[in-house]
Amino acid sequence: MVGAAGLLGPLTPVSHLEPKGWDMILSTNLTANWRLIRAMDPLLRASDAGRALFFSSSVAKTRPAFWGAYAATKAALEAIVDVYADETEKTPIRALCVDPGAMRTRMRAGAFPGEDPQTVPAAETIVPFVIDLVRPDREPPKGAVRFKDRGQESPSIDA
């Protein structure tokens, strides 16, 4: 199972966030993923190697100014996935978050409109790594996997 939906929302001071926008970002980035875990848990438990992988962001840790709602939801997502991983530790389920780093996406273009998109990797460059992480014969690392070296074509856990 892969949870990849995300909503950036407006980059604005926390005190300027509209309640409706806050609710939408929270609903998309956190609540939808919790619902996915809740709905898929029986199937993951029935699997010989259930995998629950969610996409996070470095802002879960760096928490830059004006990124309040997005940063809060990604930090909360990492927390809930860590808790779920602990709760399922004695089962075949493995849950983790992946921070792919800067990727050429619509969301990134909205956050960094002056950035040349060709200076960041295409989103599909992460696919081989994600597939490797969810292989049934692999024991994925615990917690959030973050990529420091984006010069690689296919990132690896050992990087």
Q: Could you tell me what each predicted segment is?
A:
Residues 2, 53, 95-98, 108:
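Hydrophobic structural elements of the Rossmann-like NAD(P)H-binding subdomain
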Residues 4-11:
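Conserved NAD(P)H cofactor-binding loop of Rossmann-fold oxidoreductase domains
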Residues 12-14, 21-23:
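Substrate-binding pocket helix/loop in short-chain dehydrogenase/reductase
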Residues 90-93, 97-98, 105, 113-159:
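C-terminal helical subdomain
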Residues 25, 34, 70:
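Catalytic tyrosine of NAD(P)H-dependent dehydrogenase/reductases that use a Tyr as the general acid/base
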Residues 7, 19, 45, 49-76, ...:
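Catalytic loop of short-chain dehydrogenase/reductase
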Residues 37-38, 82:
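A short, exposed helix-loop element centered on a Lys and neighboring polar residues
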